[in-house]
Structures are given as structure tokens and as C-alpha cells.
Amino acid sequence: MQTVTTRLFISGALCALSTTALAQSSVTLYGIIDTGVEYVSHANAAGGHVFRMPAVTGELPSRWGLRGTEDLGGGYSAVFTLESGFNVRDGSSGQGGRLFGRQAFVGLKGPYGTMAFGRQYTMTYLALQGADIIGPDIYGMGSLDAYVPNARADNSVTYMGTYKGFTLGAGYSFGRDSAGTGNSPGQGTCAGSVAGHPTECRDWSVMLKYDAPNFGVAASYEEQRGGTNAQANFFDGVAPTPLGNAADKDARTHVSAYAQYAGARLGAGWLGRRVVTDSPAVPNVRSDLFFVGASYFVTPAFLVDGEVFRIVNSVHDSRATMGALRTTYLLSKRSSVYAQAAYLANSAKARYSVSGGGGGTTPAAGIGQTGVMVGIKHAF
């Protein structure tokens, strides 16, 4: 009897230890698969149209990832995220072929915030989350500035802290883009960490935002330094500006706000970009991007949202206005179908493309474009 009692006690103790260990650490597998069929008018200089399955995104870029945490006690925990982007139409890896191109970091979380190390989003991307209504959609802000939905940096150290609704964020990269084809089209790579050149290919960004139950405001600043193979693309058909010197700067400043009430949400903001070069032969360039959007749940399962964008680049004499409308029907908590359409009007010299679906749809100068897509999205 004593032997049986002892065995039961040992078994119970092991179960208790196992339960405690499980409570102290966890790893979550998650992902999104999003694709569909798209039509784009005037998709080349000859005015031809295209039907296709886009490579990059629909409502959201497809991805899978692992997210984990370990409780270290005293309010501290170790955290990590490994997130891989992929293209549904052919199964290839995104972000220049990186295995974990969307995010790959490890860090420490505590009562005073989180510090993390690795490939991470910059503060530009994080600060826009509240006000940019349709986000990284195929007909979103990325059509006019493709860096915005791809604002990540290799070799980065970040800090995020929240207190009574305020969030302070900061990031610093020792070399922002060291693999693949660059974080956005035409940007080039910029590996950095070169001996004797402490600022080459650096990226630093800061963010301050405030979120209340029914509204929020945010501001951010990001500065990229030049280096070998670095460029600045304005996505308007003009050749990218070379940023070969560490003194060259590509800076983005952003302010935005949002409000929400009873199933409705309204957001608006401004994103200013300034490229300043160290060479008198290379002109400085600036652009200003304005946006306003709204969303409304008509029923708990039916969402309608849309956004209007306006970009002005006075140096290139290029301007564009784009409007997008999207409807989403929720089949379940994890699956949905959607239909969306957008129209982009280019000024006489501009060649912005309405679609952020992976290139190959640049129109002739001054020509407008229509984009239409129907798709399906599943989250796990």
C-alpha cells in the first residue's frame, strides 16, 4: 500500500511540474493564406490589360510563423518570433528569398517594455497601424510608396514600452538590408557593418503614439543612410536616386489619427519623404502622401472599408490620386471572402501603378489604371 501511495505521489508531482512548465512557456504556430484573381487595366506602355493571380498580397500578405514566450519570473519573459512570407501562386519565399523574411527576432519583455534583436519592423510601419484603414492591401498605400508595407530592417535593436495608453518605440539597425533584392522594389541592398564607416547603411526610427478606447494619434520618424548598392525609389516611373554615400539620407516623417465608434472607424494622416544626397550632381527629392479612410461593419459578418490617397512629388513633377473600395464577408472567425476595386489617376509625367501585387503593371506616363480583385483569406 505504501508503495502504491509513493508511486501516486511521484506521478502527481511529475504532472504538477509538467503543468507548471507548460504554463511558463509556449510556442504558437500561426499564419495567413490570402490569394485570388486580379484584373489591371493599362498594365503596360502599350495599354494592354492583365488577368493574374498576384504574387505578393490580397487583403493581407500570406505568411506563417512561430511565436514563443518563456516566463522568467518577476514579471520578465523571453520572447521570439520567426515569420516567413510566401507567394501562394507558386509557393516561393517572399522578402528577397529569405527564410524568415517578415520577422526574425528574440528579446526580453519586462515591466518597463520589450527589447528585441534581429530582423524587425521599423517604427514607420508600426505607427501607421491605427490610421491606415486598409493597411498592406494590394490597393493600399504601398501602391504609392512600396516601402511602407515592407518597412523592416535587418540587424536591428528595438525597444517598445507602453504606459497608460502611450507607446514609445525606437529602433536602430547596424545594416538595414543585407540579403535578397531589398526591402522594397528599387531600393537595392545595403548591408552595412563596414569597418571605418560607422553610419553606412544605418536605419533608425522612433515612434510615439497614444491609444484611447475610441481614438488614437501617432507620429514617427525614420532615417536611412546610404551605402554600397543603396537607392531611393519613388515608384513614379523616374529612375531611383543613387544613395552611394553614408552621408546620403532617405527620411520619412509621419503623423496620423483615428477614431472609432459603434462598428465604424475613420483614419487620416500624412507621410512626408525627403531624400538628401551628399553629391551636388544628384538632386534632393521630396514627396508628400496624404490619406483618409473609413470602415464600417454593416453586419457582424460584413465589412465595408475604403481609402483615398494623394501623393505629390514636385521635383519629379509627378502626382497621383488613388481611391480603393473593399468589401469582406466573414465565413467564420478564420475564413473570409472579399471583393475590391481601385482607380488611380496619374498626372502627365507620373507612372504610378494601382496594384501592389508584385510588379509588371506599370502604365504609360499620365495614364490612369483600374484594378479589381476577388479573393479568399484563411487564418490559422
Please report, for each region that a protein language model flagged, where it lies by residue.
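Bacterial N-terminal signal peptides that target proteins for export
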Residues: M1-I10
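N-terminal signal peptide c-region/cleavage motif recognized by signal peptidases
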Residues: S18-A21, S26
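Outer membrane beta-barrel
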Residues: S25-Y39, F51-D177, E200, K209-G216, ...
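Residue-level detector of the transmembrane beta-barrel scaffold of outer-membrane proteins
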Residues: T28-Y30, S77-V79, T114-G118, T167-G169, ...
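Solvent-exposed loop segments that connect transmembrane elements
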Residues: S41-V50, S92-G94, G175-C201, Q224-K249, ...
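Hydrophobic, lipid-facing positions within transmembrane beta-strands of outer-membrane proteins
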Residues: L60-W64, R102-L108, A153-V157, R202-V206, ...
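Detector for outer-membrane/organellar transmembrane beta-barrel domains
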Residues: T199, V206-A324, T328, Q340-A341
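Outer-membrane beta-barrel "beta-signal"
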Residues: L331, G366-F380
